[in-house]
Amino acid sequence: MRVRFGQYPNCGKRMVLEPGRLRPYSILRSFLDSEASAGLTLMFVAALALLLANSPFAPVYFDVLHRQVLGLTVLHWINDALMAVFFLLVGLEIKREFLDGQLATWSRRALPGIAALGGMVVPAVIFIAVNGGEPANLRGWAIPSATDIAFALGVLSLLGPRVPVSLKIFLTALAILDDLGAVLIIALFYTAELTPLMLILAAATLLGLAALNRFGVKPLAPYLVLGVVLWFFVLQSGIHATLAGVALALAIPLQASTGGGPTSPLHRLEHALNPWVAFLIVPVFGFANAGVSFAGLGLSALLDPVPLGVALGLFFGKQVGVFGFAWLAIWLKIADMPRYASWAHLYGVAVLCGIGFTMSLFIGLLAYPESAVLQDETKIGVLLGSTLAGLIGWLILRVTKAGFPERT
């Protein structure tokens, strides 16, 4: 039996809208379905990248990634340009959920928000504790603080109706808040030397985007043109270029035009981008960044401070932080347990939050831009911690009895 959104009381009431409009839970269901299948795609390309990086084709793989195209390497185009589109989608999702979705009220934000906070703080503390004797390594403190929603929902999708829908919504909301935290971390802690002129031009472009929103411009084309201009100025300013995607997302109108199309510009852009990001951009990023050669590496390499701190932070830190903070919030009656979910369900999802992959790899690149060795060690830690979290989280949820009624 396939669980349907809106089937259970905790998922909220179905809303009847004008003909042709998207129902909120249709949007969420579509999002979850695509993210789940995208997670499986991401697993495949990550495994393929590892295989190529440790095969006779490794020189070709690395040569293509470091080939210069229009002044940047292919890897830089992927990490700076394609990932800006990924962050644009992240920004759109954050804005929609905060204004008109699962995070629209403080009561809905409480449990995923508190759990997300724990899931960022505890892994960072573990990483710092492991790497305290190596000051140069401490720039990577935020690496294990991220959750990869595509991977996590991909694992949940393998469990079918054994997992309550409310728990999938909880994980989605937590991951969105986690992404918001990652965006703030990148903006505050991983900014290079700034170029004042480019910052001024970027700010002027932002004002232009704000003016379009303020005057009710609904066509997407003007926003996208200014978004490309903003990306260029941000790229040259010293701030990481991907943040231009988030800034552009905040300017896209959420309200539909009166007498116009049935959906808002934000919804149109989100649904247009979703398949491209899920099945092209994120897999390309994973393929380009997951490949690490194990040649010359022994088991002792896993005990180096960076991979050990990342792996322990993702696997132990995430589950302790997410589950511990969620338990405290429920015990203090600040938040409620997701409907039809048990403590075992919640713990299993907390373990799955240790799948860091996309955002963890991305932060690792920002943390150690000049050290290929530390970047490779980061990849090893991310792959190890994420794999353990995925396998153990799946096993916990697989053996946990479904706590909600079967309905047809």
From Swiss-Prot:
PANTHER family reported for this sequence: NA(+)_H(+) ANTIPORTER NHAA (PTHR30341:SF0), SODIUM ION/PROTON ANTIPORTER NHAA-RELATED (PTHR30341)
Subcellular location, record wording: Cell inner membrane
NCBIfam families for this protein: NhaA (TIGR00773), PRK09560.1 (NF007111), PRK09561.1 (NF007112)
Name the UniProt record assigns to this protein: Na(+)/H(+) antiporter NhaA
Provenance organism: Nitrobacter hamburgensis (strain DSM 10229 / NCIMB 13809 / X14)
Spans traversing the lipid bilayer: 42-62, 69-89, 110-130, 140-160, 169-189, 192-212, 215-235, 238-258, 277-297, 312-332, 346-366, 380-400
Bilayer topology term: Multi-pass membrane protein
Recorded catalytic activity of this chain's protein: Na(+)(in) + 2 H(+)(out) = Na(+)(out) + 2 H(+)(in)
Superkingdom of origin: Bacteria
Record InterPro entries: Na/H_antiporter_dom_sf (IPR023171), NhaA (IPR004670)
Family indicated by similarity: Belongs to the NhaA Na(+)/H(+) (TC 2.A.33) antiporter family.
GO MF term (any one): sodium:proton antiporter activity
Keyword 4Fe-4S: no
Main localization, broad class: membrane
One GO process term, biological-process aspect: regulation of pH
GO CC, one annotated term: plasma membrane
Pfam family, one: Na_H_antiport_1
Annotated keywords: Antiport, Cell inner membrane, Cell membrane, Ion transport, Membrane, Plasmid, Sodium, Sodium transport, Transmembrane, Transmembrane helix, Transport
Described purpose of this protein according to its UniProt entry: Na(+)/H(+) antiporter that extrudes sodium in exchange for external protons.
